[in-house]
C-alpha cells in the first residue's frame, strides 16, 4: 500500500522489451535506502516489484498488459517518474490509500496558474469519472491530490507550487497522458450497494446423468 506522497523523482535509465513483458531500470537515490529485492516501489503510481538493485538504480518487471493499460507505454529513456516505497506499518499516512493498481489513463487538457496554485484539468473515460467526486481524493501519476471540480468529460485539481516542484508535474505539458487511480473506498461502496448477481450453479442432476453418474 502507498499514500501518494512522492519521495523522489527518478529517471528511466533503460527499457528492455521482451515478448510478454518489459524490464524498467530506474535511476534513483532515496527509494533505494533499505530497499531489498522483492520490495514494492510505485513508479508513476504503478506498484512494481524490485527484481534487481544497483548502486544508482533498480530494475522491475512490467507485464505488457500493464504497459497497455497505463501511461508507462509513453515512457522513454530519460523520462522523469514519481517514486514512492510501500508504506511501512509505523509510517506517516500523509495522503490517502493508494493501491498502486491504476484504473486507466487520463490526458492533460489544460494547465493554468493563478496567484497561489497551478490547476490541471484532466480528461478521462466515463468509467473512471464515475468514481471521481468533488473534494475527494485521486491519484495522478502516483501523486495524492484533491479533486477541485468535476465536469462531464473530466476533472480539475489544484496543486501548490511545492507539490509541483517535488514531483514530475513541473515537466508535464498539455496533451500528456497520466496514470489515474480513483479512491478505492468508492469502489468498495459501489460493490456493497450493487453486488453482482450470484452465478448460477451449472452442476445439475441432468448434467450428472448425461456424464454417466
Where are the model-predicted features located?
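Conserved loop->alpha-helix
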Residues: 1-213
Amino acid at each position: 500500500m502507498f499514500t501518494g506522497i512522492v519521495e523522489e523523482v527518478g529517471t528511466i535509465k533503460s527499457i528492455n522489451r521482451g515478448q510478454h513483458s518489459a524490464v524498467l531500470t530506474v535511476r534513483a537515490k532515496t527509494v533505494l535506502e533499505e530497499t531489498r529485492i522483492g520490495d514494492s516501489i510505485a513508479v508513476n503510481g504503478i506498484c512494481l516489484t524490485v527484481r534487481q538493485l544497483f548502486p544508482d538504480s533498480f530494475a522491475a518487471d512490467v507485464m505488457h498488459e500493464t504497459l497497455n493499460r497505463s501511461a508507462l507505454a509513453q515512457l522513454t529513456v530519460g523520462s522523469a517518474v514519481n517514486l514512492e516505497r510501500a508504506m511501512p506499518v509505523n509510517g506517516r499516512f500523509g495522503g490517502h490509500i493508494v493501491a498502486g493498481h491504476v484504473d486507466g489513463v487520463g490526458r492533460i487538457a489544460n494547465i493554468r496558474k493563478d496567484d497561489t496554485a497551478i490547476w490541471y484539468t484532466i480528461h478521462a473515460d466515463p468509467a473512471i469519472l464515475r468514481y471521481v467526486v468533488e473534494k475527494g481524493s485521486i491519484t495522478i501519476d502516483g501523486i495524492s491530490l484533491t479533486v477541485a471540480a468535476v465536469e462531464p468529460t473530466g476533472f480539475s485539481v489544484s496543486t501548490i507550487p511545492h507539490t509541483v516542484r517535488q514531483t514530475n508535474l513541473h515537466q508535464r505539458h498539455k496533451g500528456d497522458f497520466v496514470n489515474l487511480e480513483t479512491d478505492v473506498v468508492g469502489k468498495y461502496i459501489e460493490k456493497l450497494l450493487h453486488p453482482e448477481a450470484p452465478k448460477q450453479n451449472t452442476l445439475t442432476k441432468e448434467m450428472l446423468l448425461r456424464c454417466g453418474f
